[in-house]
Each structure stands twice: as structure tokens, then as C-alpha cells.
Swiss-Prot record:
Acidic residues compositional bias, start-end: 391-407
Domain F-box positions: 1-45
Gene3D superfamilies found in the cross-reference section: 1.20.1280.50
NCBIfam families linked to this entry: F_box_assoc_1 (TIGR01640)
InterPro entries linked to this entry: F-box-assoc_dom_typ3, F-box-assoc_interact_dom, F-box-like_dom_sf, F-box_dom
One biological process term in Gene Ontology: response to arsenic-containing substance
Region entry Disordered, spans: 385-407
Lineage: Eukaryota, Viridiplantae, Streptophyta, Embryophyta, Tracheophyta
Organism for this UniProt entry: Arabidopsis thaliana
Stated name of the protein: Putative F-box protein At2g16220
Length: 407
């Protein structure tokens, strides 16, 4: 049937259900279709469809080379015990290697509204933003710092702007800076803050606020500033800081609110091999009033080992998601869904990594959506067409860390 006999609304309704890669191809069909796909109405419709079915995003790094996969996020009504991951891309433009490290001082990774931010662990490393679905990327301007700064990434949903935050060492020279991505010439600009603090965690962005863990106890701040471990809240729109006293834990998105996971017997910085079957969850209900809701959960099936899994978030239906930290083709890779209402734990095997990589460290994100607003961002370049055939880089030598087997 000729498309001229179909209404625009019907065409848009059908096409909004397609994957991002397919929509991108249809841009070339005609000027009419290109115009429709570029309209704010279709972009919002497509994002609404994608947000209704968020996916798990897996970023696997092996010797500085990153590969991205995604799989359906299985809700609690699903009885499926196996899910297949779709391979999206291998990120290695011009043989660039982005090395990772478990310490946020040396390596930063962030996810915000469809984009991944990486700042590698090496001298002269540069920050990079990429779209894990399409392979488009940009390398941000270098930001001079004493040694290497802590770095974070987030999205302001009101002004619809992505921002990268670079925080210097409190005792070092220079200035903390922020960069707005997507418009203009992408220059870093100075930001002011009065509270000196050490930084202890990666950041997480929720509804335009960046959160990370820090410590003010070693610095001479004003008397009204909490001394000790703190939750740092940075509003991306106003570019202002708030500090809340809080012990160290693990930060997750809890149905659109910031939550902190605590284990019953260990400090979060001290990852043990002991099996765990209990956790405490604090949900930040009000930032200004510093009010928390507190929950404690236990389970009996499939005891987990903190050295092998991490909490990565919560689904819209209220299940807390755990993911394995390491992948090896010699054994299955699992994601766990914990239902607080029933106190039960589901284990789902993720298949599909083995065709593209043998081993690696895995970073998992719970609420990955495809957003057309990030498809044609001004500064993005194209990586070589994403490989869709199974491939190994036999020249990559296995490091001692990557050789760890998870039981």
C-alpha cells in the first residue's frame, strides 16, 4: 500500500514500536518520513513506548575494549528463567582503549537517558560519551586537573541537557568544572562550592539530581556542615550542592527516588566473600527535610556473595535487581530479581555474551531506554558500523583480574 494512503498518525503509531536502529534507517526513505521522525511529537511518542519497556544494559570491558548488550527486563509476572542479550556494538574508535578500575578516583562510568559516559583509568585519559545502541560517540575536551579528577554524568529532564561534572582533589590546585553536552562548543566552566569533601563512590542521576557518597571529616568546613560520611546531592539545573549525613552504602534508583543499600554486617567498602541473605534499604523521601523510609529484607533461596554480585536498581514493579560483576564463557551469567513483597529471589540466566567475548568485567544498568533525542546530537561521530558477527580479539591477553572465576 502506498504510504500516501496512510495517515501520518497511523504511520507514526506503527513506527514508534520499532527499534531505534530500524527507525534510523527509515530516515532515508523520503523527505516526508525524515520530517516525521524529526518531529517533537514522534520523538516523545517513541520515548514513551521505549520507557514502557526498559531493558537491562550490559557494558562489558576486556582490556580497555567495551562491548554493549541489552536484554528484556523480566518483570515479576514472568516465569522465564533465561533471557537472550542483543549485541549492539564494540566501542574501540581508532583503537582507543578505555581502561576501568574499581576505584572512582581512577575510573568513572555513568548512564543517563540513553547515553553512557566513560572516563578511563590511564594518564592522559579523556572523557567519552557514546550511544550504546547506535555506536555514535564523542570525545569531550580535556579538562586539566591535578592528577585525575572524579567525574560524573547526568541528564536534566527539564532543560533536556546532558552534563558532565569534574570534581578536583580538595587539596589540589585548579577548579571543579561542569560541561553541558549537546549545544555550543562544549567548554568546561568553573563551578563554585564551599564544602570540601573526599569522594567515595560512582554517581547516579535521578530526575536531574546527581548523587554520590563522600566524606567531609578531614576538611575544615563551616560549622553547619555535617562532619563525616555524607550523601552529596548536585542539582544539574541550578548547579548547586546539598549534603546529607549518611553512612556508606550502595546507591540505586528506587522507583524514581534515591535509595541506599546497606548490608547487615559489613561496611560497603569491605566486600566480603561471605554469603548474604539480608539487606537494609533506605529511601530518600525528601531531600530538603532529609527524610528517609527504611526497610529490611531477607530471603532464603540462592544466597548471594557480595564479591560476585552488585545491586543495580529496581524495576517499576518493585523488584530489586542484582547482577554478576564478572563474565566468563566457562560458566553461566545470572541476573537476580528480589521481590520484597514475597521475600523470594528469582535467578535469570543471560545468554548471548559468549558469541562476542570470552570474559570481562560487567557494568549493568536497569532502566535503559532508546531515545531519538540522542540519535542526532550535534557532536556525535560514527564508530565503524557495529559488528553483528561473533568475533574475538585473540590478541587480547587475559589479565589476572579478568581470569577470576565466579562460582
Amino acid at each position: 500500500m502506498n504510504s500516501h494512503f496512510l495517515t501520518n498518525d497511523l504511520i507514526l503509531e506503527v513506527l514508534s514500536r520499532l527499534p531505534l536502529k530500524s527507525v534510523a534507517r527509515f530516515h532515508c526513505v523520503s523527505k516526508r518520513w525524515a520530517s516525521m521522525f524529526g518531529s517533537p511529537y514522534f520523538k516523545e511518542l517513541f520515548l514513551t513506548r521505549s520507557s514502557a519497556k526498559p531493558r537491562l544494559l550490559f557494558a562489558i570491558v576486556q582490556n580497555g575494549v567495551w562491548r554493549f548488550f541489552s536484554s528484556p527486563r523480566l518483570e515479576k509476572s514472568s516465569s522465564t528463567l533465561v533471557a537472550t542479550a542483543e549485541f549492539h556494538m564494540k566501542l574501540s574508535p581508532n583503537n582507543l582503549r578505555i581502561y576501568h578500575d574499581n576505584t572512582p578516583r581512577y575510573f568513572s562510568i555513568g548512564y543517563a537517558s540513553g547515553l553512557i559516559y566513560l572516563y578511563g583509568d590511564r594518564y592522559e585519559a579523556t572523557p567519552l560519551i557514546c550511544n550504546p545502541n547506535t555506536g555514535r560517540y564523542t570525545i569531550l575536551p580535556k579538562c586539566y586537573t591535578y592528577r585525575k579528577a572524579f567525574s560524573f554524568f547526568g541528564f536534566d529532564p527539564i532543560d533536556k541537557q546532558y552534563k558532565a561534572l569534574s570534581m578536583i582533589y580538595p587539596s589540589g590546585p585548579g577548579h571543579s568544572k561542569i560541561l553541558t553536552f549537546g549545544d555550543g562548543d562544549m567548554n568546561w566552566k568553573k563551578i563554585k562550592y564551599r564544602v570540601l569533601h573526599d569522594i567515595y563512590s560512582q554517581g547516579i542521576c535521578i530526575n536531574g539530581v546527581l548523587y554520590y557518597l563522600g566524606d567531609t571529616s578531614d576538611w575544615d568546613n563551616d560549622h553547619d556542615v555535617t562532619s563525616g560520611n555524607v550523601l552529596v546531592c548536585f542539582d544539574l539545573r541550578s548547579e548547586s550542592f546539598t549534603f546529607i549525613g549518611l553512612e556508606c552504602g550502595q546507591l540505586i534508583n528506587y522507583k524514581g527516588k534515591l535509595a541506599v543499600i546497606f548490608w547487615d554486617d559489613v561496611d560497603d567498602d569491605d566486600v566480603k566473600d561471605d554469603a548474604i541473605d539480608e539487606m537494609h534499604v533506605w529511601v530518600l523521601e525528601d531531600v530538603e527535610k532529609k527524610e528517609w523510609s527504611k526497610y529490611a529484607y531477607t530471603w532464603t533461596e540462592d544466597k548471594l556473595y557480595r564479591s560476585q554480585v552488585s545491586v543495580v536498581g529496581m524495576t517499576a514493579s518493585g523488584e530489586i535487581v542484582f547482577s554478576m560483576r564478572k563474565y566468563t564463557s566457562e560458566q553461566p551469567f545470572y541476573v537476580y530479581y528480589f521481590n520484597p513483597e514475597r521475600n523470594n529471589l528469582r535467578r535469570v540466566e543471560i545468554q548471548g555474551f559468549e558469541a562476542f567475548t570470552k570474559f570481562g568485567t560487567v557494568y549493568t544498568f536497569v532502566d535503559h531506554v532508546e531515545d531519538l533525542n540522542v540519535y542526532n546530537l550535534k557532536h556525535f561521530k560514527s564508530v565503524h558500523p557495529p559488528s553483528v558477527q561473533p568475533e574475538y580479539d585473540e590478541s587480547d591477553s587475559e589479565s589476572e583480574e579478568d581470569r577470576e572465576i565466579i562460582i
